[in-house]
């Protein structure tokens, strides 16, 4: 058998001996860092240090190995063994082992010519020319006092009539401080009143929008995330006179900064046949009153009936600082079928997200949606805002808590399961033979394409060549199920 086959299959079945002996930055480590880290860790982005060159990465090599080995970085909260989402950013076991082997070997640089190249990170919109741009009224000043700041900005629409849209895209003005954003919609004028009562630009609000606007939760942004871009015939409607609400979370900074974030609005190219609605599981769906006693870990279980066949597009659990975990799923009437939706075993308020399923996900009529969340209101919770712990109830403030699951959905139609909601992920790009499993057959196909340049079917990293970097990507996906 060709020695390259032996090499590939040996790695695929877990020996890792070649990687342990010969791993270098340019051949093995750079693709991992560029694929998982550099979207945030580069100049002008939220990462506190850049990881763009050998010298930059090597100087933090041991630190990178540690924070990735414990799952702290990259910051992806959903459990990838439970369900998958668009933009999933999780290091595989072979990738983690490669980083460890590289550090153990003394962080060798290797041949710069073997580097597949720095990614092309687009500036401006990631999905095209917007039809409207909603902007903050002025740049928001961050004083540089090392505080986390949560500010809501009211963006009037002033459009004639209801407006059908296919996408909203948050365009941060200053990635040095823009940590994440939440979008909402207000048709009551309440947000404008809160804004008028606050002398600062916008108004401060930690947990949400400062009033009961949860039913108008409209999306979210975190660094590296692609905006939700609905398929043809599917979209949302912004009522005439509505205000778009932009809650910005600004991370701590030691120097004064300013931010002027914009929201790009993309109108539907065709009439909306199915409007996206947001189903909300909240405290009223719980099995017990939403009260968190001090010095106690408390769990809640909420349920919602599914009254029609629906297709899910996105999901976003939401709690505050005392929350520690989430688990959302659907069950059949006889409890013989469970549809996994999202599991977040280690909830982090600062990295909450609006997670898009790879394909529309059907939940049949008669099923039940379940949401389970745990809250640690003890002194052992380092994020507990109360010292000592206090009785905690539902509310908008930092020391309050919430239980919400936001789910975007449409009424189901035949074939929805085949409709992709994001770009093809490497997970399924590596399924070359189309059997929904990344396995030996796919490894052999990649091997047959090894050395190809330009228009290569096995070019997983899109660098116009099939190289060792593609081998490593496939090994990281080996055994994955693309369903």
Predicted regions and their residues:
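Sec-dependent N-terminal signal peptides
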Residues: 5-14
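Cellulosome-associated attachment modules in secreted, modular CAZymes
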Residues: 83, 424-483
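Short clusters of hydrophobic/aromatic residues that line enzyme substrate/ligand-binding pockets
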Residues: 51, 73, 218-221, 430-432, ...
